[in-house]
């Protein structure tokens, strides 16, 4: 299992200003990233005669495709938040100064969901990426059975019927 899959919790990050080399690699290790609209990015190891070894070669290709990854890894060109968004390196771009508030708002919306369902969903997405869709699909029924028999699933249905926000317990 990768380190990403070993984490149970969703990691969200926010970036602002200059995000070069290891900054990009740390950012790409997060599940959800919010960037300020004034960010500058560059993966510049090749300018220093070395290779990016903190995960950029893997995660850039995973998120943006081989050609886009190689374009930025091999040229060390600087790019902005709009390009990072286009490449799926960041999931939201907000005006500078609002990135922390937006990241916290996303974290609060995730925290309001059923904890076991959040973990199961996140792990299934990562399994599909790392082991293929068939492996992820194979987990659908057994994982759904566990979740459907939980107190949180019962609370989710009750809350839907009663038209109120659910109060999940993690059980």
Where are these regions (language model features)?
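C-terminal long alpha-helix characteristic of the crotonase
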Residues: 34-39, 81, 90-138, 146-151, ...
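Short, basic/aromatic-enriched C-terminal tail that caps enzymatic domains
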Residues: 156-171
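Short alpha-helical scaffolding segments that buttress acidic/His motifs in well-ordered protein cores
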Residues: 72-73, 121-125, 144, 160
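CoA-thioester-processing core
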Residues: 14, 20-74, 87, 102-106
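Single conserved hydrophobic/aromatic residue that forms the stacking wall/gate
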Residues: 1-7, 11
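Acidic, divalent-metal-coordinating active-site segment for phosphoryl/phosphodiester hydrolysis
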Residues: 76-83
């Amino acid at each position: 299992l990768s380190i990403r899959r070993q984490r149970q919790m969703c990691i969200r990050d926010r970036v602002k200003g200059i995000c070069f080399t290891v900054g990009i690699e740390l950012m790409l290790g997060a599940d959800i990233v919010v960037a300020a609209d004034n960010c500058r990015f560059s993966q510049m190891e090749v300018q220093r005669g070395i290779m990016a070894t903190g995960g950029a070669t893997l995660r850039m290709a995973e998120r943006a495709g081989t050609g886009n990854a190689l374009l930025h890894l091999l040229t060390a060109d600087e790019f902005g938040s709009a390009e990072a968004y286009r490449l799926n390196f960041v999931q939201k771009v907000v005006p500078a100064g609002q990135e922390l508030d937006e990241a916290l708002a996303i974290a609060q919306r995730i925290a309001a969901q059923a904890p076991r369902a959040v973990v199961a969903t996140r792990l299934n997405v990562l399994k599909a990426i790392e082991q293929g869709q068939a492996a992820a699909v194979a987990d659908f029924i057994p994982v759904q059975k566990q979740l459907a028999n939980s107190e949180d699933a019962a609370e989710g249905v009750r809350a839907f019927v009663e038209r109120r926000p659910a109060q999940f317990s993690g059980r």
